[in-house]
Amino acid sequence: EYFLSPLEPIPSEERIHFTKPDLCLLLAIGILYSCFALYDLGDRKAPTTTYDMSGELQAIELEFPEDALPVTMASYLAPWHQRHFGMDVKSNAEDSWTYLGEIILNNVFTWQDVSLQDLLTQATENSTSDMSATTRYLRLSLTDNDASLIELVFLDANGNITRPLNADAYPTLFDESDLYPERYSFRNSMYFDEIYHARTAYEFLHGLPTYENTHPPLGKIFIALGVAIFGMNPFGWRIMGTLFGIAMLPFIYLLGKKMTRNTPAAALACFLF
């Protein structure tokens, strides 16, 4: 009669001990990373009120003070990009409009400039007759189906903001000029793939057709959560990704400890991450 010999017990994998030095190193790395990640993440305020335009050839007509004619137009638009406008100017109310050319407002939630002086100079050079028009009166005519302008800011030759005399006719277009930045940067504008993902998060919140649909939506839903809490500004659309980055550090540390079974090696792996 044969008897089966008892099976030899298989030793379980040695348990990894998370020691006090591990905790101290992880906390130190987490605090250090958090300070760098959260510092100067972006402005907490940005223009939000919109002036919506629909239907081709819808126009905005503006009048400026004679002693503060605009030479630069700064724009901040969303949610649609690459909006096409025709620009016309004239010196007096009774004059005919002089066409300067087409301008394209490109990226969303991004400050961008259009040089009115360059357009005026180019139009003068291309004109077959004497042209004496100035930017005292300015007209922007939409040539796309839809556009939504969040803010327009006009600057005179000294770089000072010049407000249209009839700005009250477009109350949501000139109500947040105090948020116009002295210098355009990541602090006040989108950069890299934010023009896709943060924009789509905004569209989620407002029930709009989504522009970016090639990536799974979960990450953009988290971005939308940050926007819902902190507003549609650089801080709002970046904070959730930053917090998730901080939350990943313990998992990276534990993975390094499991693979190396060594505290300094785990700390180095987490730090390099």
Model-found features: residue ranges?
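Alpha-helical transmembrane segments
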Residues: 22-36, 171-173
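Aromatic, loop-rich ligand-recognition surfaces of beta-strand-rich domains
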Residues: 36-110, 116-186
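Transmembrane-helix motifs of polytopic, lipid-linked glycan transferases
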Residues: 235, 239-260
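Extracytoplasmic catalytic/substrate-binding loops of multi-pass membrane glycan-assembly enzymes
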Residues: 45-50, 165-180, 186-198, 210-222, ...
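Membrane-interfacial, low-structure loops and terminal tails that flank and connect transmembrane helices
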Residues: 2-20
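Short helix- or helix-capping micro-motifs
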Residues: 266-273
